[in-house]
Every structure is written in structure tokens, then in C-alpha cells.
């Protein structure tokens, strides 16, 4: 007959086991602020609608398709540079706020 092992943990097993995890805090704030998402969606729409719209406006005004393509490419680049500029301004504002916070903490 085989012997049964008790269901309780031995002292060595209990000491080696990791401590029970505490409940995680219920922080439900989004990782990315909503205004950043709205800006991204706006520039995405501008990147889709702007160049295509400029292409068809240019073609319908009597210009060649080559000129219309160049106009669409320029429009896409303007939207891209606009997004980069807005992102740079947001980042600069965040860095200034963080430096002010550090200054205030140091005092």
C-alpha cells in the first residue's frame, strides 16, 4: 500500500513560494491622451482627403495629370510637415511643464 502525502504544504514549500500578489490598482486612464488621438485622426483624414482632393481639383481645372500628381504630392508633404510641427509643439509644451515641475520640486 502506498502512503499518501498530506495536502498541506511543508515549511520548505511555503517558504519558497512567492508571496501572494496584491490587487493591482485600477488605473483606467488611457495611455495616450484623447487630444493626441483626435489630432492623429484629423491629420489622417487630411492625409487621405487632401492629396486626393487636390489631384481631382487640379485635373478638373484643366491641368495635366502630371501637374495634378505633383500638386497631390506637395499637399501630402504639407500635411506631413504640419503634423510634425504640431507634434513638436506638443512635445515642447510637455517638456516645459516637466521642467517647471522639477524646478518647483527643487525649491
UniProtKB/Swiss-Prot annotation:
Keyword set includes Ion transport: no
Membrane topology type: Multi-pass membrane protein
Compositionally skewed regions (Basic and acidic residues) per UniProt: 1-11
Subcellular localization(s) per the UniProt record: Endoplasmic reticulum membrane; Endoplasmic reticulum-Golgi intermediate compartment membrane; Cytoplasmic vesicle, COPII-coated vesicle membrane
Segments on the Lumenal face: 61-68
Short motif Prevents secretion from ER, span: 104-107
Pfam families reported in the protein's UniProt record: VMA21 (PF09446)
Presence of the UniProt keyword Thylakoid in the record: no
GO-annotated biological processes: vacuolar proton-transporting V-type ATPase complex assembly
Keywords, sorted A to Z: Cytoplasmic vesicle, Endoplasmic reticulum, Membrane, Transmembrane, Transmembrane helix
Biased composition (Low complexity): 12-26
GO cellular component: endoplasmic reticulum membrane; endoplasmic reticulum-Golgi intermediate compartment membrane; ER to Golgi transport vesicle membrane
Entry's transmembrane regions: 40-60, 69-89
Disulfide bridge positions per record: none
InterPro entries, sorted: Vma21
Source taxon at top rank: Eukaryota
Stretches in topological domain Cytoplasmic: 1-39, 90-107
Region (Disordered) residue spans: 1-28
Similarity annotation: Belongs to the VMA21 family.
Functional summary from the UniProt entry: Required for the assembly of the V0 complex of the vacuolar ATPase (V-ATPase) in the endoplasmic reticulum.
Alphabetical list of PANTHER family matching this protein: VACUOLAR ATPASE ASSEMBLY INTEGRAL MEMBRANE PROTEIN VMA21
Protein known as: Vacuolar ATPase assembly integral membrane protein vma21
Organism: Neosartorya fischeri (strain ATCC 1020 / DSM 3700 / CBS 544.65 / FGSC A1164 / JCM 1740 / NRRL 181 / WB 181) (Aspergillus fischerianus)
Amino acid at each position: 500500500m502506498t502512503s499518501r502525502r498530506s495536502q498541506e504544504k511543508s515549511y520548505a514549500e511555503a517558504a519558497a513560494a512567492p508571496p501572494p500578489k496584491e490587487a493591482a490598482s485600477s488605473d483606467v486612464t488611457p495611455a495616450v491622451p484623447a487630444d493626441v488621438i483626435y489630432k492623429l485622426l484629423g491629420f489622417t483624414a487630411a492625409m487621405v482627403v487632401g492629396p486626393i482632393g487636390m489631384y481631382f481639383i487640379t485635373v478638373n481645372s484643366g491641368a495635366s495629370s502630371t501637374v495634378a500628381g505633383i500638386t497631390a504630392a506637395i499637399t501630402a508633404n504639407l500635411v506631413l510637415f504640419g503634423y510634425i510641427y504640431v507634434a513638436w509643439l506638443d512635445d515642447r509644451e510637455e517638456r516645459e511643464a516637466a521642467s517647471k515641475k522639477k524646478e518647483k520640486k527643487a525649491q
